Every structure is written in C-alpha cells, then in structure tokens.
Amino acid sequence: MNRLKEKYNKEITPALMKKFEYKSVMQVPKIEKIVINMGVGDAVQNAKAIDSAVEELTFIAGQKPVVTRAKKSIAGFRLREGMPIGAKVTLRGERMYDFLDKLISVSLPRVRDFRGISKKSFDGRGNYTLGIKEQLIFPEIDYDKVTKVRGMDIVIVTTANTDEEARELLTQLGMPFQK
C-alpha cells in the first residue's frame, strides 16, 4: 500500500472526523482523482511538439495521456477544429497516490525560490488547481532531451464540500501551503 494512502487511512481520517465532527467515516473528504493537463500552443505550427508533450506526460504520470483537440476553429490563432492542441491524463487509485507523493516530496521542493503553494487556488467546491511553469521539476524528465520548457495544470479533485475541508485534507497529506 502506498505511503500516503496508509497515512490517510490511519491518521488523517480520524483527525478529520474529530475536527469537522463527521458522524460517518464516509463523510470524510478524500482525493477522487488528479488531472494533469498540458496545453501545447505551438502544436499548431509544429506537429511534432504534441508527440514530445505526450512522451513527457507519460513519464511524469506513469500512464499514457489522451491528446486534446480544438473544439472550434479560431482564425486569429490559425487553429482548425479537431487540431491537436494539448494532452491530459487522469490519475486515480494507486497511481494517483504515487504521483501526489512524488509531487509533494520530490518535485515541488525542486522549484526555484519555492516558498509554498498558494492557498487561494481552491474553486469553492473543494478542488485545488496548481499551475507548474516547467516540466523539469519532475525527476523522470531528462534535462538534455527537453526540446521546449512547458508548463502544466494539475487539478486535485476531492470529495470535500468546502474549501476549508479540502485545505485541511491536503495540509494533512503534506501539501506545502504558504504561511
């Protein structure tokens, strides 16, 4: 069993039940899924860019991402409907906990001038969105093979009803929020 999942079951669940006075264990918020999205704007001119993004996302997430395509044509961006413009991957279960553990303990501390992540990125429904400026913070990415520095969005979807509950859950899991 994953280290974070074990910690969640043994320590975090009882602590959250006590703090928020839940009557049932099923009311305790948990992480449902993590969605990693990488927009590749230069895929419009360069079709190979999407392949490198898919490859990098595969290394980072441990599973193959799905290529996202344009829903509408936008003349200003020279974009046609159906053109590949990004890649996303949804992690659940064991892989989700592995990725979160790696993100908290290895990747985030590698960010330059890292002082913690913002507390304001909750959406009001208990989900947290985190933007990363470069994919090089992940240990799986080989620095020499990177063609272009790309950022990504990481959305952590929880079953929490409020932001306060979700913040407490992520703090207990070890998310380094700003003081």
UniProtKB/Swiss-Prot annotation:
UniProt cross-references to InterPro entries, sorted A to Z: Ribosomal_uL5, Ribosomal_uL5_bac-type, Ribosomal_uL5_C, Ribosomal_uL5_CS, Ribosomal_uL5_dom_sf, Ribosomal_uL5_N
GO molecular function annotations of the record: rRNA binding; structural constituent of ribosome; tRNA binding
Organism domain of life: Bacteria
SUPFAM superfamilies attached to this UniProt entry: RL5-like
One term under GO cellular component: ribosome
PROSITE patterns: RIBOSOMAL_L5
Pfam families: Ribosomal_L5, Ribosomal_L5_C
Keywords: Ribonucleoprotein, Ribosomal protein, RNA-binding, rRNA-binding, tRNA-binding
Any one Gene Ontology BP term: translation
Keyword Heme included in the entry's annotation: no
Function per UniProt: This is one of the proteins that bind and probably mediate the attachment of the 5S RNA into the large ribosomal subunit, where it forms part of the central protuberance. In the 70S ribosome it contacts protein S13 of the 30S subunit (bridge B1b), connecting the 2 subunits; this bridge is implicated in subunit movement. Contacts the P site tRNA; the 5S rRNA and some of its associated proteins might help stabilize positioning of ribosome-bound tRNAs.
HAMAP family, alphabetized: Ribosomal_uL5_B
PANTHER family noted in UniProt: 60S RIBOSOMAL PROTEIN L11-RELATED (PTHR11994)
Family as reported in the entry's similarity comment: Belongs to the universal ribosomal protein uL5 family.
Record text on subunit structure and interactions: Part of the 50S ribosomal subunit; part of the 5S rRNA/L5/L18/L25 subcomplex. Contacts the 5S rRNA and the P site tRNA. Forms a bridge to the 30S subunit in the 70S ribosome.
Designated name of the protein: Large ribosomal subunit protein uL5
